[in-house]
Amino acid sequence: MSRYRGPRVKIIRRLGALPGLTNKTFKSKSSFIDRSTSNKKVSQYRIRLEEKQKLRFHYGLTERQLLKYVRIARKAKGSTGQVLLQLLEMRLDNTIFRFDMAPTIPGARQLVNHRHISVNNGIVDIPSYNCEPGDTITIRNKQKSQSIITKNTNLFQKIKIPSHLTFDSTQLRGFVNQTVNREWVNLKINELLVVEYYSRQV
């Protein structure tokens, strides 16, 4: 399944707020899941499906990419669900988004793809690059690159940058202090249901 490129309003109304997909908010319709269905097996499957879709659309992943991350998380030490969220949160495109350098994760991915971003003084154009504690993320020393980021940081300031990151808005320089903690994930999600959804595929 390819990355979703359709209307974002439709997704938000169906699944609720997904800040990585869009910074706009809409009045949600009732969930596409029929909670009152008498077939509990089908209902539980759809609940898990909804949580999986939230994760996929928020981070802008294909089905294959998300499944790959689940498999990696299952092999790691610790809670599979929390490791999964850490893997997704530490992606370069998401880190750029959390720095307020872009209004959405797709916007951050575009900055990376267009080679506006440097990590530890080297250009990185891979959105899935895994950021690690100690990484320094900067903007290419080009007027166009710096102009885009400055505009974004001025327009799309969020309430608070998570504690595992530090951003110097005057130098347009970000630092990864540590691996993200669960409480700093800015998505309302039950990651255990996502792991359960994929339990037969991994």
Curated annotation (Swiss-Prot):
Question: Signal peptide: which range, if any?
Answer: none
Q: Which residues cross the membrane?
A: none
> Which stretches make up the S4 RNA-binding domain?
90-159
Q: Which CDD domains match?
A: S4 (cd00165)
Keywords of the record = Chloroplast, Plastid, Ribonucleoprotein, Ribosomal protein, RNA-binding, rRNA-binding
Looking up Pfam families in the UniProt record yields:
Ribosomal_S4, S4
Q: Which domain of life is it from?
A: Eukaryota
This chain's function reads: One of the primary rRNA binding proteins, it binds directly to 16S rRNA where it nucleates assembly of the body of the 30S subunit. With S5 and S12 plays an important role in translational accuracy.
- Which family would the database say this protein is a member of? Belongs to the universal ribosomal protein uS4 family.
* Protein name, entry field: Small ribosomal subunit protein uS4c
Natural source organism: Jamesoniella autumnalis (Liverwort)
Q: Which gene encodes it?
A: rps4
